[in-house]
Amino acid sequence: MLVEPVSGAPAAVADCGAERALVVADYHAGIEAGLRYERGVELRSDADGRRERLCALRDRVSPDCVVVLGDLVHRIGDPGEGEHDEVEALLDALAVPLTLVPGNHDGGVADAYDRIDVADAGGLRLGDVGFVHGHTWPDRAVLGAKTVCMGHEHPQVRLEDEVGGGRTERAWLRGRLRVAPFADHFGVASEALGWTTPELVVFPAFNDRSGGTWINVEGQSFLSPFLPDGLADDAEAYLLDGMRLGAYRRV
């Protein structure tokens, strides 16, 4: 498996050929300040906790680099002071190269941090693995990978017990991509894409305060322009502990 989830964590290890990458999505540094401004919600900063959790994963899997699938920061535009300090502290602590595939929240990152390798918005391909945030269509080169990793959706499942109680859990979503929506987007015949039916891996949000999309609840809509049409109907959901839930629409 080219992309192997880390058991019990919203992270995976990607085999990129020449190197192994620790991959996470939707870190949302500075989210507490954003929630205070956007919703009037007061939460104590978990900046230290986020950094420690990511560094613990680095120690656990010993990667050559870290890839963030977008939304490293929460504030759209130039990072605020607290957010900037959080990211600088993270870079100091990680001590391995960090690549960011920019998301819709990362507009000011390239100018603010010279220690981050910022990819193009259309994504990045390393070996047989492609990386995108998911808020825009992937580049064709990314779609040529065997496995494509994305964030943006913050997938969650709503689970209910026999007496009507319920809980929400972060989840992975994995399935094959359909060629038709991508051929339509690029304005070419399906054959012209050299389609190899790549697997899509939608990552749970690393930040547990960032909400999410209930992928198994009717009426909840996806955020990405190529979902759900670009994903096979038999795509499956998995919990962070690895439990396979089956086809995500029927969980």
Q: Which sequence ranges carry the predicted segments?
A:
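Zn-dependent metallo-beta-lactamase
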Residues: 1-22, 249
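Glycine-rich phosphate-binding loop signature in dinucleotide/nucleotide-binding domains
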Residues: 16, 61-62, 142-144
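Active-site-proximal beta-strand elements of phosphoester/diester hydrolases
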Residues: 21-28, 128-135, 148-150, 201-204
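Core catalytic region of metal-dependent phosphoesterases/phosphodiesterases
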Residues: 22-27, 31-128
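Active-site environment of divalent metal-dependent phosphoester hydrolases
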Residues: 30-32, 74-76, 104-112, 137-141, ...
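Short, conserved loop/helix-junction motifs that constitute active-site signature segments
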Residues: 91-94, 141-144, 195-196
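A contiguous pocket-lining binding segment that forms or flanks enzyme active sites
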Residues: 115-185
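Acidic, His/Gly-rich catalytic cores of divalent-metal-dependent hydrolytic chemistry
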Residues: 160-251
